[in-house]
């Protein structure tokens, strides 16, 4: 800390100002304001961050000493003011906690009660927010013994004012001789760390990470230092290196990583104007700018900054693992067990694998891959001993092109993917210890690569490893209940290692610009060649990487009731083996991208596409389903259900004659029977018919189906979606049919706000039925579009809406494709625009992916003809862009093909 820094705090000038004023408060406030401005300017000008946070602690020391001196403490008063916690370490960010301990010799606080209260009131009045406790030396011992947080705080203390001997007595009575011996302290701190990591989903890669508490954050470094302090009395990284726990290079890496996080935290506090340790979207862009990051052709400044952040915390996590493992071996192990040999290079020691000698990786570099294969083959191995982790770090520079092309290494790497257990766990270890990104440089490029959106909630490398984890979990019984089809298929894949390898490469092309699927396919081809895979295996992996998005896109954006869509997709996959691999990869990809994306409706779409495609392949691609044949089958099966329930077939025939082919193509026989039975029982003047099908019989069946039958009216869609918006329903699919008798038969698939179906909640079902019926009975009372606040996260991912309009070559409709930021009431707004432009909606596919929607609308003009006027299309596009823009930049993307 500085001894004198008059620019930050001029003691003489401050004392003079105190003497001139009747009240000291104004002088203190002025000094605090000035110091804040000086420190902020120093940060912006690039001042060394360590000096900066020490400067702030020094300034607060001076302010507290001056405040303490405002009161009459006798020279021999047994009372002292101590800094504890982070402030005790001499580290203060702009809004860090200023933790104080007022330490007394006697348990009787009464004699000092009044001056202490006046002192704390002064601190409050001058705007210094402190956390304080008042304890005697004995009380420190009592509370420290009972509370891990208290003993941790007391270990980091400095005397600000008053006699130093009180602090020394406090340290003596709270030492390891009296409480919290190093073993007990380490176990408690390690458990505390695990609990904290679990709170942040055990990942360094959260979208809005906590700079202090997330895995790899500042708290992990502090945990290392606390344990070292309890064991050795050292309280900084340099001293820890002196104890042999850190190499010089490791000490330098930890120190530079800590300083980077300090910069981020300082900037966070400065921008937020409060104590804020969450790296929120609100601040990420501005911090990237403050720290000097700029946009490039391939990456935004924020992506470059966040990649740096994730790589830093990953380095901290790696070193934390090493040091904690070292502590565990030194503090906990009795070292009584004998090592059990695994082979000439490795042995098992206390359940952990270790190299048999320090030269193993130097003499046999292939052992850097072998160690992970051995752990996968022996799942009882708990992990890697600290010295061996360090040896891996020291020798990983040997991984060069010769290493990558060595048949021993390529064979071992493929062997890992053939193991029955431990594939994901050991790939994560390889990534954590920096081996994976060196062995596969293309993987190294995606480490810490964040995509700046809400759709992808993990970095590319974390998502990739999560995907492999999901593939592996499909073999677990508890997971197979949620993913029955994917689990069944996974179990019968002829070569499961190929799906893992495809998963490893599916997103590896991201962050380079261009089509990541094509770039990844090129890398996958090179991987197959280098690893001497059979041609068929390589071709399958390359095909999967190149086309890993096709099944999801088809399921969510195409009409799966159209036989031509199924036939085209069946032709694309070619055979059941490719279909099986692609389905399993798609399911794992969606679940590994963002757990909230996987809902019952998306699951049912993929299942339907898989099942229908499999039927088409077994029937033979040369025998596609004829539209008339499908209609005939649906009608026959539906009529059989109705007749068995006592319905007059003549009534059915009369009803069906007005419905048209599309209705029977888009609905199952069961749905046709359900609709027909209700329609035929509906009184002529009964108003709108609203049917709601509950789906709780099968937990993962899909969304809730709402069927509406009523006389057609121009604003029917607009009124319906506005009413559903008011009912807090999320629409995922819409099928709009108008009969020749001018009745509309609309089917909506909806989910609740939690992504589930409505289920067997009679009150909720009745609320929906009543709300829709009332709105459709009184269409003139157009439901008001609810003006909900746009969620904070969505505001930071706003982009200009993109609208593509073209006519369908096979059907007499115009296709309007919308890519836009999500916002409350979006569909209701679209419906209002269609109403204003006198358009009829024939069909819709709705998909919400994170912060964006990807919707497809099939529309016609009022005469049921495709749109043909480019000017009208341009006006329509402008209206949509204007209505849906959310904090987006000016301009939009329009492609019209009429």
From Swiss-Prot:
InterPro entries, sorted: ACT-like_dom_sf, ACT_dom, HD/PDEase_dom, HD_domain, NT_sf, PII_UdlTrfase/GS_AdlTrfase, Polymerase_NTP_transf_dom, UTase/UR
Domain ACT, chain residue ranges per copy: 705-783, 815-891
Region ranges (Uridylyltransferase): 1-341
Sorted UniProt keywords: Hydrolase, Magnesium, Multifunctional enzyme, Nucleotidyltransferase, Repeat, Transferase
Pfam family, one: ACT
Inhibition and activation profile: Uridylyltransferase (UTase) activity is inhibited by glutamine, while glutamine activates uridylyl-removing (UR) activity.
Assigned EC number: 2.7.7.59, 3.1.4.-
Cofactor section: Mg(2+)
GO MF terms, alphabetically ordered: [protein-PII] uridylyltransferase activity; phosphoric diester hydrolase activity
Keyword Lipoprotein appears in the UniProt entry: no
Region (Uridylyl-removing): 342-704
Substrates-to-products reaction catalysed: [protein-PII]-L-tyrosine + UTP = [protein-PII]-uridylyl-L-tyrosine + diphosphate; [protein-PII]-uridylyl-L-tyrosine + H2O = [protein-PII]-L-tyrosine + UMP + H(+)
Swiss-Prot/TrEMBL domain comment: Has four distinct domains: an N-terminal nucleotidyltransferase (NT) domain responsible for UTase activity, a central HD domain that encodes UR activity, and two C-terminal ACT domains that seem to have a role in glutamine sensing.
Cross-referenced NCBIfam families: PRK00275.1 (NF001366), UTase_glnD (TIGR01693)
Annotated protein name in UniProt: Bifunctional uridylyltransferase/uridylyl-removing enzyme
Annotated organism of origin: Pseudomonas savastanoi pv. phaseolicola (strain 1448A / Race 6)
Gene symbol of the encoding locus: glnD
């Amino acid at each position: 800390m500085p001894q004198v820094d008059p620019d930050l705090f001029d003691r003489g000038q401050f004392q003079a100002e105190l003497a001139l004023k009747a009240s000291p408060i104004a002088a203190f406030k002025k000094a605090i304001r000035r110091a804040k401005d000086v420190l902020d300017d120093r940060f912006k000008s690039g001042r060394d961050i360590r000096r900066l946070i020490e400067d702030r602690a020094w300034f607060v020391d001076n302010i507290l000493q001056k405040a303490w001196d405002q009161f009459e403490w006798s020279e021999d008063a047994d009372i002292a003011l101590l800094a504890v916690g982070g402030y005790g370490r001499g580290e203060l960010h702009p809004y860090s906690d200023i933790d104080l301990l007022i330490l007394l010799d006697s348990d009787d606080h009464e004699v000092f009660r009044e001056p202490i209260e006046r002192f704390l009131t002064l601190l409050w009045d001058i705007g210094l927010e402190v956390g304080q406790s008042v304890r005697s030396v004995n009380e420190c011992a009592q509370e420290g013994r009972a509370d891990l947080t208290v003993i941790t705080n007391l270990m980091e203390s400095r005397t600000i004012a008053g006699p130093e001997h009180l602090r020394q007595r406090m340290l003596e009575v709270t030492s390891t001789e009296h409480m919290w011996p190093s073993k007990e302290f380490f176990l408690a701190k390690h458990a505390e760390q695990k609990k904290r990591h679990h709170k942040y989903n055990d990942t360094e890669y959260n979208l809005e990470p906590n700079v202090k508490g997330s895995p790899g954050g500042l708290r992990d470094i502090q945990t290392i230092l606390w344990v070292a302090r309890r064991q050795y009395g050292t309280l900084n990284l340099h001293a820890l290196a002196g104890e042999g726990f850190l190499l010089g290079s490791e000490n330098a890496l930890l120190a530079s990583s800590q300083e980077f996080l300090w910069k981020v935290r300082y900037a966070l506090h400065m921008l937020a104007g409060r104590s804020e340790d969450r790296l929120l979207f609100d601040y990420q862009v501005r911090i990237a700018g403050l720290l000097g990051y700029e946009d490039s052709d391939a990456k935004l400044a924020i992506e470059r900054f966040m990649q740096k952040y994730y790589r830093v915390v990953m380095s901290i996590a790696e070193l934390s693992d090493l040091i904690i493992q070292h502590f565990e071996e030194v503090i906990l192990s009795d070292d009584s067990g004998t090592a059990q040999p695994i082979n000439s290079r490795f042995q098992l020691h206390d359940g952990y694998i270790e190299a048999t000698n320090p030269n193993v990786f130097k003499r046999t570099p292939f052992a850097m891959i072998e160690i992970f294969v051995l752990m996968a083959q022996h799942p009882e191995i708990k992990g890697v001993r600290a010295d061996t982790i360090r040896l891996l770090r020291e020798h990983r520079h040997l991984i060069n092109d010769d290493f990558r092309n060595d048949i021993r290494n390529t064979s071992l790497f493929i062997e890992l993917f053939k193991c029955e257990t431990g594939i994901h766990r050991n790939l994560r270890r390889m990534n954590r210890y920096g081996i994976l990104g060196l062995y596969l440089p293309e993987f190294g490029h995606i480490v810490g690569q964040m995509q700046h959106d809400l759709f992808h909630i993990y970095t590319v490398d974390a998502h990739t490893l999560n995907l492999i984890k999901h593939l592996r979990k499909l073999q677990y019984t508890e997971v197979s209940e949620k993913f029955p089809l994917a689990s069944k298929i996974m179990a019968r894949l002829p070569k499961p290692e190929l799906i893992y390898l495809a998963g490893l490469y599916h997103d590896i092309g991201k962050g380079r610009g261009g089509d990541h699927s094509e770039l990844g396919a090129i890398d996958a081809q090179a991987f197959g060649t280098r690893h001497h895979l059979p041609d068929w295996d390589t071709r399958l992996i390359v095909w999967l990487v190149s086309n890993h998005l096709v099944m999801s896109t088809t399921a969510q954006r195409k009409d799966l009731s159209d036989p031509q869509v199924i036939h085209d997709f069946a032709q694309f996959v070619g055979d059941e083996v490719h279909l099986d691999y692609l389905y399993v990869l798609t399911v794992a990809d969606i679940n590994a991208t963002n757990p909230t994306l996987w809902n019952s409706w998306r699951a049912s779409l993929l299942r339907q596409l898989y099942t229908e495609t499999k039927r088409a392949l077994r029937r033979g691609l040369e025998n596609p389903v004829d539209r008339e044949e499908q209609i005939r089958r649906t009608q026959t099966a539906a009529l059989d259900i109705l007749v068995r329930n006592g319905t007059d077939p003549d009534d059915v025939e009369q009803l069906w004659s007005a419905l048209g082919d599309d209705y029977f193509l888009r609905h199952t026989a069961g749905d046709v029977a359900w609709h027909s039975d209700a329609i035929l029982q509906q009184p002529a003047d009964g108003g709108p018919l609203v049917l709601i099908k509950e789906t709780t019989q099968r937990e993962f069946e899909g969304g809730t189906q709402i069927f509406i039958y009523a006389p057609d009216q121009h604003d029917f869609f607009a009124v319906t979606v506005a009413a559903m918006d008011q009912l807090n329903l999320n629409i995922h699919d819409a099928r709009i049919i108008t009969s020749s008798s001018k009745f509309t038969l609309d089917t909506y698939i909806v989910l609740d706000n939690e992504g589930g179906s409505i289920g067997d909640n009679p009150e909720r079902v009745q609320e929906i039925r009543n709300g829709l019926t009332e709105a459709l009975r009184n269409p003139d009372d157009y439901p008001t579009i609810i003006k909900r606040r746009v969620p904070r996260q969505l505001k930071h991912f706003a982009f200009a809406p993109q609208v593509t309009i073209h006519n369908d070559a096979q059907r007499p409709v115009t296709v309007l494709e919308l890519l836009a930021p999500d916002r409350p009431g979006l569909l209701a707004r679209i419906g209002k625009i269609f109403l204003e432009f006198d358009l009829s909606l024939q069909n819709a596919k709705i998909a919400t992916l994170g912060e964006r929607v990807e919707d497809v609308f099939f529309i016609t003009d009022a005469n049921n003809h495709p749109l043909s006027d480019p000017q009208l299309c341009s006006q329509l596009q402008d209206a949509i862009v204007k209505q849906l823009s959310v904090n987006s930049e000016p301009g939009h993307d329009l492609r019209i093909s009429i």
